[in-house]
């Protein structure tokens, strides 16, 4: 806005000259000087200059002061520029803008309060009706454990979430509701507050409740948002802070505009809104660091564009710094918590300055990395394509079209035509593009793998806040455009009537239909109220363990879910659960190992290749004679030291670690046969539409299948080379186990291949050990051949990605051709 006057506070520019222009003649309409008469004869004047009356605070006689018409007109244009109102589509009549001016300092009118209450109650009720009844997958188990115990979460700590989670998990007086449900309910309520901020943003922007409700509901009940806001995760609060910053930007802009036209007697001046914005930016960063990608463009716009003439003085800057530090204060909990409340499964040694900085900067993962391993090389274009495809899933074609119209209106409207790049709409577009380009370039997740693709998708929620806001702007743009067409083509009377009817009936009907479709289409897909699968999975891991077992775990699912049941719901208090991931950090010896009195740690850290480190073999040697040791999930990669002295026998979802010198004491076939007969049986979420391959439910089913594959692998290693009755039974048992594995995941390549191997060996043994004239044996061998052919054909057709790594690939193809 190169031609717009500099914004300044009305306190400094108020006119105290009560005699200026008060006696001007009423016939000066055509006079080129800038003094205009406030005489009542000007009511019929057709010129477009608008008289502004400013109340003089020092005038006890309430004398009216006339403001210069040119200044008034320029201020009006400036207002439209800042809010993208001057683009010819989202257009306001002067009288409408005057009404907004009169009400700008009073956001919470009765109608607004009614919409806020409606949003909060409806969203919270629907969310609570569809929540997980207990623990869910991913990081939720760990975050709930840490929040309930008031510990420190994985880097960067999430102190705001854990603090509020601790309050919610203890303040709700109910023994029937699980700890996980209580913290998930907190997320649901916070998600409802995010919806309120989205509504207020759009409402303050276009002055239409229905447009605000459309944006709020479409966002709240989009599949991705719904999924993560009904479980104990940090994303719900992060969405709330993104929406809050959008709201504060619009609010600050409006108050600044109208402070130039009259003295603001309300509490919330633009200066105080700036302080609130600083506090909100800071406290939002104590929940999740990805908010910084929204904070950076927002803070730049606030300090260097919209408030550059107001906020750059020592007093205000000092206050902004003060409120920023207050907002960051929850990070003090990372210092205090380890000293006052040492609990199991709490991360880091944050009680020291070095430990705090290391945790805050996520140095253990890589400060600017989401993934600690070697991520896949995926182009930015591919990632953006995935995002656009996902937008269609989230909002449908109509919702995406409305968002596109809203974005184009901001991008190609008055801003570009007159280079008004300083508007709030421009800031929103820049924030969206900044997040998309910066984060997608930063993301090093191997998204070619389904589970990590799901992790990648959850970071779409922040830009989706902006997309939902532009949806409300888009539908308002359409109706504004239709209004202009009718205004240009009809008489004044008919136009007014038509516009009124459109606004009053058609807009609400369309919005109700869109919102109803969004909720109705996604409700069943997001309803997790009966999903006890993770709860049952955790019990299946823990319930079969012998008394006083030491359970080593590796992997998020097999760690977080059993840990939640053990520490929050006090399941199996006799056992100890140790995460091999946490054992490998240097701080474990200081903060965690003292809490495990019955466990011996033969060094400072679980790392076989550093001084004072120890290997898994050293750890097992120190503890194997004291208690049973089981492993759940995977061993730590890079440490094979134990393999010469220990082996494992699969027992359900875990495996017992046994010294090889004691192997004669165990009959592998009988043990696996017994445990397979009692293999966990619970409701499996096998609805592929509801639980696609990037969901934690699908990953859990894969873990179930892998546990069965481990049992079959143990049998095959021991019995495949043997030629006796027990080995034949072991092969038959392996077939049963692998066929069950395929009921969980029907395209498990390892199972398909080794089923063929089992049938090949069974066929060979039948043919070799019985008389060829035995028809029953021949039929049995023929059946084995058919089964071999079926599974190996399926393996070749479905597992083409194994061709370059499987040395048996060509052999299997030749066998298929021969049979």
From Swiss-Prot:
Keywords: Endoplasmic reticulum, Glycoprotein, Glycosyltransferase, Membrane, Transferase, Transmembrane, Transmembrane helix. It is an enzyme of class 2 (transferase). GO terms for biological process: protein maturation. Its EC number is 2.4.1.109. GO terms for cellular component: endoplasmic reticulum membrane. GO terms for molecular function: dolichyl-phosphate-mannose-protein mannosyltransferase activity. The keyword Protein biosynthesis does not apply. Pfam families: TMEM260-like (PF11028). Glycans are attached at residues 18, 38, 70, 349, 531, 686, 693, 783. Residues 1-68 are annotated as: Disordered. It is a multi-pass membrane protein. It catalyses: a di-trans,poly-cis-dolichyl beta-D-mannosyl phosphate + L-seryl-[protein] = 3-O-(alpha-D-mannosyl)-L-seryl-[protein] + a di-trans,poly-cis-dolichyl phosphate + H(+); a di-trans,poly-cis-dolichyl beta-D-mannosyl phosphate + L-threonyl-[protein] = 3-O-(alpha-D-mannosyl)-L-threonyl-[protein] + a di-trans,poly-cis-dolichyl phosphate + H(+). Residues 15-68 have a biased composition (Low complexity). The chain crosses the membrane at residues 113-133, 152-172, 185-205, 210-230, 232-252, 285-305, 316-336, 391-411, 427-447, 459-479, 505-525. It is found in: Endoplasmic reticulum membrane. The keyword Transmembrane applies. Residues 1-10 have a biased composition (Polar residues). O-mannosyl-transferase that transfers mannosyl residues to the hydroxyl group of serine or threonine residues of proteins. Belongs to the glycosyltransferase 117 (GT117) family. This is Protein O-mannosyl-transferase tmem260. It comes from Dictyostelium discoideum.
């Amino acid at each position: 806005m190169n031609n717009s006057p500099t914004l300044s506070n009305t306190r400094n520019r108020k006119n105290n000259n009560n005699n200026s222009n008060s006696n001007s003649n009423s016939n000066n309409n055509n006079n080129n000087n800038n003094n205009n008469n406030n005489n009542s004869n000007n009511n019929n004047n057709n010129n477009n200059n608008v008289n502004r009356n400013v109340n003089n605070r020092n005038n006890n006689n309430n004398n009216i002061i006339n403001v210069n018409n040119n200044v008034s007109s320029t201020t009006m244009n400036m207002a439209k520029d800042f809010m993208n109102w001057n683009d010819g589509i989202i257009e306001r009549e002067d009288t409408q803008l005057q009404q907004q001016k009169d009400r700008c300092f009073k956001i919470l009118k009765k109608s607004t309060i009614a919409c806020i209450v409606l949003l909060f109650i409806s969203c919270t009720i629907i969310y609570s009706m569809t929540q997980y009844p207990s623990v869910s997958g991913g990081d939720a188990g760990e975050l709930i454990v840490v929040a309930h115990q008031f510990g420190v979460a994985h880097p960067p700590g999430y102190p705001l979430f854990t603090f509020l989670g601790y309050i919610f998990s203890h303040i709700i007086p109910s023994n029937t509701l699980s700890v996980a449900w209580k913290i998930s309910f907190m997320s649901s309520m916070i998600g409802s507050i995010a919806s309120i901020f989205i509504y207020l943003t759009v409402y303050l922007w276009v002055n239409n409740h229905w447009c605000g409700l459309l944006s709020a509901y479409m966002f709240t009940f989009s599949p991705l948002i719904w999924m993560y806001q009904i479980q104990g995760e940090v994303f719900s609060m992060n969405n709330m802070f993104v929406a809050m910053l959008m709201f504060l930007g619009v609010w600050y802009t409006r108050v600044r505009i109208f402070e130039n036209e009259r003295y603001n007697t309300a509490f919330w001046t633009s200066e105080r809104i700036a302080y609130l914005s600083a506090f909100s930016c800071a406290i939002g960063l104590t929940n999740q660091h990805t908010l910084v990608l929204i904070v950076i463009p927002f803070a730049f716009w606030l300090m260097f564009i919209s408030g550059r003439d107001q906020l750059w003085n020592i007093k205000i800057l000092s206050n902004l710094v003060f409120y920023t530090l207050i907002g960051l204060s929850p990070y003090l909990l990372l210092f205090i918590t380890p000293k006052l409340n040492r609990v199991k499964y709490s991360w880091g040694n944050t009680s020291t300055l070095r430990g705090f900085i290391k945790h805050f900067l996520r140095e253990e993962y890589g400060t600017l990395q989401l993934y600690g391993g070697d991520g896949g090389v995926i182009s930015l274009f591919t990632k953006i394509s995935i995002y656009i495809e996902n937008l269609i899933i989230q909002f449908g074609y109509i919702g995406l079209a409305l968002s596109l119209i809203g974005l184009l209106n901001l991008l190609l409207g008055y801003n570009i035509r007159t280079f008004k790049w300083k508007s709030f709409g421009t800031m929103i577009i820049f924030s969206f593009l900044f997040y998309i380009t910066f984060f997608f370039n930063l993301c090093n997740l191997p998204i070619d793998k389904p589970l990590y693709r799901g992790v990648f998708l959850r970071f779409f929620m922040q830009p989706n806040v902006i997309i939902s806001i532009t949806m409300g702007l888009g539908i308002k743009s359409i109706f504004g455009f239709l209004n202009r067409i009718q205004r240009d083509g009809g008489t004044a009377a008919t136009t007014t009537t038509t516009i009124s009817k459109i606004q009053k009936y058609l807009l609400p009907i369309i919005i109700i239909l869109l919102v109803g479709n969004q909720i109705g289409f996604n409700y069943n897909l997001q309803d997790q109220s009966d999903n006890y699968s993770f709860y049952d999975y955790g019990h299946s891991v823990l319930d079969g363990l012998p008394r006083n077992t030491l359970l080593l775990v590796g992997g998020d699912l097999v760690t977080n879910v059993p840990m939640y049941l053990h520490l929050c719901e006090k399941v199996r208090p006799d056992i100890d659960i140790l995460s091999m991931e946490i054992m490998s950090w240097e701080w474990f010896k200081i903060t965690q190992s003292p809490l495990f009195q019955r466990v011996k740690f033969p060094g400072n850290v679980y790392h076989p290749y550093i001084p004072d480190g120890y290997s898994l073999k050293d750890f097992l040697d120190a503890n194997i004679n004291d208690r049973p040791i089981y492993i759940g999930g995977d061993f730590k990669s890079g440490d094979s030291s134990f393999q010469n002295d220990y082996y494992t026998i699969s027992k359900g979802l875990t495996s017992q670690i046994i010294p090889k010198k004691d192997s004669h004491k165990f009959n592998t076939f009988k043990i696996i046969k017994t445990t397979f007969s009692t293999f966990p049986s619970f409701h499996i979420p096998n609805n592929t539409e509801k639980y696609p391959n990037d969901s934690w439910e699908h990953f859990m089913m894969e873990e179930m299948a892998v546990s069965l594959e481990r049992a079959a692998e143990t049998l095959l290693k021991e019995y495949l080379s043997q030629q006796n009755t027990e080995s034949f039974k072991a092969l038959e048992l392996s077939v049963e186990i692998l066929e069950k594995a395929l009921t969980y995941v029907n395209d498990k390549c390892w199972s398909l291949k080794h089923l063929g191997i089992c049938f090949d060996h069974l066929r060979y043994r039948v043919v070799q050990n019985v008389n060829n004239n035995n028809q029953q044996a021949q039929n049995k061998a023929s059946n084995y051949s058919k089964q071999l052919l079926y599974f190996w054909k399926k393996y070749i057709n479905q597992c083409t990605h194994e061709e370059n790594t499987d040395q048996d690939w060509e052999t299997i193809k030749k066998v298929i051709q021969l049979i």
